[in-house]
Amino acid sequence: MPEASVRGVILNYEVIGSEGPWVALTPGSRRSYHELIPLSQRLAQDGYRVLLHDRRNCGASEVGIEGIGSEHEIWADDLHALAGQLGALPLFVGGSSAGARLAILFALRHPEAVSGLLLWRLTGGQHAVQKLARQYYEQFAEMAKAGGMVAVCASEHFSECIAARPSNRARLMAMQPAEFIRVMDLWRDNFLAAATLPIVGATEEQLRNLKMPVCLIAGNDKVHTPVTARKAAGLLPNAVFHDDVVEKRPDDNLLDDWNPAEWRSKEPRIAELFLALMAKATGRS
């Protein structure tokens, strides 16, 4: 797969489709982009070019642990720089969960570069913030405190990053544990500060100021709650909201975790909704 040097790290990326308006999609958590290939292929069939990439610290891209703002802000600026290198601006930006946070931060930081937002499984609320802060940051800080960078390299996530790009081990081992812990703590604190926001990553005022068209698909689990999606849809002035893509569940009976199989089975419907919004936004409908 092609690679690009972006803001001090090498990013692994792929473009699906050969012509048409540009789209960038990003998965949730720190997962590789590969799960989004089938959805991207469906969009490409309708004449769009889809940019997929592994974010820094994810998949086959380089590790880059830097204490500059939040991790999601770094990811958003990386994607903007990568898309600029490829001549892919402006573009529709989308993603699920962490990828949706990236997309919203991209729009807040680079509004002139965004044609529209394609969002599914938005994250919000105290339960989600506490759970994910531990998953993304606290556990790794504890590993570094107990066993140094050797322990971090042996973790499930970073061992996968090393398997995908062996040079990542040397990059991690070159870090002082104290600096690694400082950055994890900084990123954790930035994440925890979002517990009372409508969604993780944006205030009410910021959401109201996003004027581009938005397709927003609600989740049905305790991390990606329908309440969070409804709040965001009510604040985004040009949002088209869908809460019937996956099984609708009452707010007091949500799944503990999202169901990957359920979401995969709904990809044709997700593609249909995204294509409808993009066709209208580009005048192709």
Regions found by a protein language model. Give the residues of each.
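Catalytic active-site module of serine/aspartate enzymes centered on a nucleophile-bearing elbow/loop
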Residues: 239-285
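Active-site loop/oxyanion-hole signature of alpha/beta-hydrolase fold enzymes
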Residues: 52-91, 257-266
